[in-house]
Amino acid sequence: MAAEAGKASEGMVDLEEPKKMTREDWRKKKELEEQRKLGNAPAEVDEEGKDINPHIPQYISSVPWYIDPSKRPTLKHQRPQEENQSKFAPIGDWYKRGVQEKSVNTKYRKGACENCGALTHKKKDCLERPRKVGAKFSGTGIAPDEHQQVQLSMDYDGKRDRWNGYDPDEHMRIVEEYSKVDLAKRTLKAQKLQEELASGKLMDQANSRKHEEAVQDHSSEDEDEDKYVDDFDMPGQNFDSKRRITVRNLRIREDIAKYLRNLDPNSAYYDPKTRAMRENPYSNTGKNPEEVGYAGDNFVRYSGDTISMAQTQLFAWEAYEKGSEVHLQADPTKLELLHQSYKVKKDDFKEKQKETILEKYGGSEHLDAPPRELLLAQTEEYVEYSRHGAVLKGQEKAVAQSKYEEDVLNNNHTCIWGSYWKDGYWGYKCCHSMVKQSYCTGEAGKKVVSNSCTPFEEDVEEAQTSEEPKTLLQMHQEKLKDKKKKKKSKKHRDSDSSDEEDEAKKKEKLKKALSAEEQRLKQVAELMQVDERKRPYNSLMEVREPTEEEMEAFRMKRCRPDDPMASFLGQ
């Protein structure tokens, strides 16, 4: 019995509490750990025969009692547990498509749909037409069971796999289709060559040199494709051989990308996200920015009102340091007016300072001296003239002249051609003539043109739009409409007069309320100056709801401390 009890105890896991270690055992354990860390003693081995790293801390390597009470050295509790891992479908599984439903059963089965007899759904989910006598009672026309698709659980990569469920056999069908098309093209070409050979055209054409080039082009693959397209329509292709449309690329090939202007990696930085190159790419090459077609995008930062806004912001900071409460975003109007007045005063101060210095020391005659070119009668500026005196090259820019003749008056005209415009045509202003190179007719021509502008069609339209005779019914309906209009206009006049009276009464009430509010504010100001102990009490016997006019007067006279312009009300 004792041996059996010992064997049973060996098979069972020791669930006793851990005994307290002695000092000697604790010292030996620590020495063994140090030896293992130094590599002088073999490392611990888990149940799978793998070495346990001795440098792993104890709080990681020790096994909780509720996971493995055997206290064996292991790291299994730190590894992912297989029973808790989610299982995903293999790569070959996918939904079956095109499964044919065949009705094999001829008898009704228990638990099937009472309407059609299929086992995959119930009567309330049946999509067939409700039968007069269901399959449960008739036993005929048993519908086939729907194919139940497999439930696939895909992992992260499987859900995003674009080739998931792809069948390579589908591509083989396309290859077979193109092979059939190629075979048909070859047979057509062979038949056509046989017909030309039988008719004798091929021998005549072979003698000429032009036909040799045509045969070479004819044998090329591109010619075969064009020939096939002319005769057939490719299955699955939307191509019309009767109208061929060629779309040209409208991009200008002469333009240069920003990042290709200077290939030096130390030159201006190109931001590919915003497609911006702020600095000048030709800065290190020594070229003048004015002579270069592109000098960077930094010029946009200084365009518009950027410089004036920066000057205003600088003025606001300087004024704030000197005690003025101004802000560019909070008080833009006030800051702008203050800045303008500062500029005017600054200019006046400079002028006065200049005048006082000239009055004190003199020398105003030197400021009014003629230019240096007139004094020395020579300059270092290069100017090139033509034989006719026109400026070709130099400081003064030559005026561009038109290639057409200007201010040419011919055929007695006093105005040039194009000085008059009417109804989409150009003409002469002097005689209103629309014919170029015509002779001027003066005021007589203007009268003729003005008289000829009265069309005959207007008289015809007026004759056509003459009033037709009206019936008695139409006349009666028009009278009723006139009466209704008169009644409406009379009511509208009465309502307008009443509205004007109401507005006048409201204005009078508002004036009275404003005067009463002013008196109340004066009384409040007087009471606030009196000592608190001497102020009278407020009686609640006369409390009533204020009228609309009194509320409006209170709002108009109320002082708002948060109003930025409140400080200017007393000025």
Swiss-Prot record:
Pfam families: Slu7. The gene is slu7. GO terms for cellular component: cytoplasm; nuclear speck; spliceosomal complex. This is Pre-mRNA-splicing factor SLU7. Belongs to the SLU7 family. GO terms for biological process: mRNA splicing, via spliceosome; RNA splicing. Residues 16-37, 207-219, 514-523, 542-563 have a biased composition (Basic and acidic residues). A zinc finger (CCHC-type) spans 111-128. Residues 1-91, 199-235, 462-571 are annotated as: Disordered. GO terms for molecular function: pre-mRNA 3'-splice site binding; zinc ion binding. Required for pre-mRNA splicing as component of the spliceosome. Participates in the second catalytic step of pre-mRNA splicing, when the free hydroxyl group of exon I attacks the 3'-splice site to generate spliced mRNA and the excised lariat intron. Required for holding exon 1 properly in the spliceosome and for correct AG identification when more than one possible AG exists in 3'-splicing site region. May be involved in the activation of proximal AG. Probably also involved in alternative splicing regulation. Residues 482-492 have a biased composition (Basic residues).
